[in-house]
Amino acid sequence: MDIKACYQNAQALLEGHFLLSSGFHSNYYLQSAKVLEDPKLAEQLAKELAKQIQEAHLNIECVCSPAIGGILAGYELARALGVRFIFTERVDNTMTLRRGFEVKKNEKILVCEDIITTGKSAMECTKVLEEKGAQIVAFGALANRGICKRTHSHLKAQEGACLPSHLPLFALEDFVFDMHKPNSCPLCATSVAIKPGSRGN
């Protein structure tokens, strides 16, 4: 399955000057919501991701996503895996588990995002779940921006990666684009970064 073509066909691979939720600036932005607005494609992508996870023979009892960007991807992945789905969300800028969602002690959970850049949001979600006694067994995403190490990828983890190295990250594709710290972004010389993404927007 050509994941890059899926993003291009859905007009979800945007070019410009963007402020990513990780804080980095980039000339490309992946808008997964445009890909996931097609239920059949969302189901197909989730099944592809679930296949990778099932081949790893992991015991997963639940999928959890940080709102809002990860919700559609996480729900479809949970459906493909046949497990329940919950999500965390920010309240006053603090990641929280609410809406009656509960986790059991030692419940084995996969944290799923639509896109993994540094993994910061996924780790905020992880912290909430672990504080409630859950056991995080893996991470998943439709796409990986190449900072974190993905299972089945030759790319190594880069500076800024937040995900723990001892847990697998399953994703369908690496999208490696230039990313810049705000204080050294060459794009800022000619334009202002816009934020089309999820965190704080």
Curated annotation (Swiss-Prot):
Pathway(s) of this molecule: Pyrimidine metabolism; UMP biosynthesis via de novo pathway; UMP from orotate: step 1/2
Gene3D superfamilies, per database record: 3.40.50.2020
One Pfam family from the record: Pribosyltran
EC number of this enzyme: 2.4.2.10
Keyword flag Magnesium: yes
InterPro entries, per database record: OPRT, Orotate_PRibTrfase_bac, PRibTrfase_dom, PRTase-like
Class of enzymatic activity (EC top level): transferase
GO BP field: 'de novo' UMP biosynthetic process; pyrimidine nucleobase biosynthetic process
Needed co-factor(s): Mg(2+)
Residues engaged in binding orotate: 117, 145
GO molecular function: magnesium ion binding; orotate phosphoribosyltransferase activity
Binding site for 5-phospho-alpha-D-ribose 1-diphosphate: 113-121
Keyword set includes Phosphoprotein: no
UniProtKB keywords: Glycosyltransferase, Magnesium, Pyrimidine biosynthesis, Transferase
Domain of life where this protein originates: Bacteria
Catalytic activity: orotidine 5'-phosphate + diphosphate = orotate + 5-phospho-alpha-D-ribose 1-diphosphate
Subunit structure: Homodimer.
Function: Catalyzes the transfer of a ribosyl phosphate group from 5-phosphoribose 1-diphosphate to orotate, leading to the formation of orotidine monophosphate (OMP).
Family of the protein in this entry: Belongs to the purine/pyrimidine phosphoribosyltransferase family. PyrE subfamily.
Record's protein name: Orotate phosphoribosyltransferase
